[in-house]
Amino acid sequence: MSEDKVVDVAVGVLIRENGKVLLSSRPAGKPYAGYWEFPGGKVEEGETVHAALVRELDEELGIKLADSFPWFVMEHRYEHAHVRLHFRRSREFIGDGQAKEGQEFGFFGAEERTPGLLLPVDQAIIKRVDLPDVWEDSTEILTLSENALHATVVRDRKYRFVGTRAGTLDDVLKAVAMDFDFVIVKPELFEASLKNGEPRLPTYVEGVPAADLRVWQDKGAHGVKPC
């Protein structure tokens, strides 16, 4: 494989009503065999990311995916491949799963999401699964200066997540560089950012009603922060 070739991969974050999320182990014969991950696979030529995810979940686990919506995209360079990971969330699927490739799998809650070693990328971002769909006002806001990058930091009161507000596309890129868990933006900035592709971080759209949550999630937002 060419060192410069980027492989697009569809990644499914399937969440049950009780908040448990699907994880599976990588089967023997694949790189990182035995490591756990969010399931998914390579996007074939001519496929949408959603279509690739539908196919992969059926082939690997016998799960029928009804719908999914974009969450965020990130790139990672492994020893064997340079991948662009398109994370998509779904609560609309049928089936409990089958080990079609001899892998282990299960739905895990927040306190049990380490059934084994996780892939490095998944280990880094798995707590983002628990970000609420609606960001409430009960947050602490302060100013951070780190490596000459300035940002307004937003934390939930339990200090589980650290995010930032972004007023420009440049601010969004800074948030990615500073490895924040999420970013809060105005609707017009979110719309403008989509011209550059899928969000690079879980994104809250600020100043819109909670009733419009699914509208914004269908566009790629993680959630909303009401007025």
Language-model features and meaning:
Residues F182-F190, V208-C227:
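Glycine-rich phosphate-binding active-site loops on the catalytic face of alpha/beta enzymes
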Residues Y159, A177-F180, G220-A221:
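A structural motif
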Residues L144-R160, T168-V172, V185-L201, A211-D212:
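Active-site-adjacent beta->alpha loops and helix N-cap segments on the catalytic face
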Residues K64-V73:
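A short coil-to-beta-strand element that immediately follows conserved catalytic motifs
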Residues K20-E59, F72:
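Conserved Nudix-box catalytic region and its N-terminal flanking loop in Nudix hydrolases
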Residues R16, M74-D96:
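Active-site-adjacent beta-strand/loop module that shapes the phosphate/pyrophosphate-binding cleft
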Residues M1-V21:
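Conserved N-terminal beta-strand and adjoining loop/helix that marks the start
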Residues R89, G97-V129:
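NUDIX/MutT-family hydrolases
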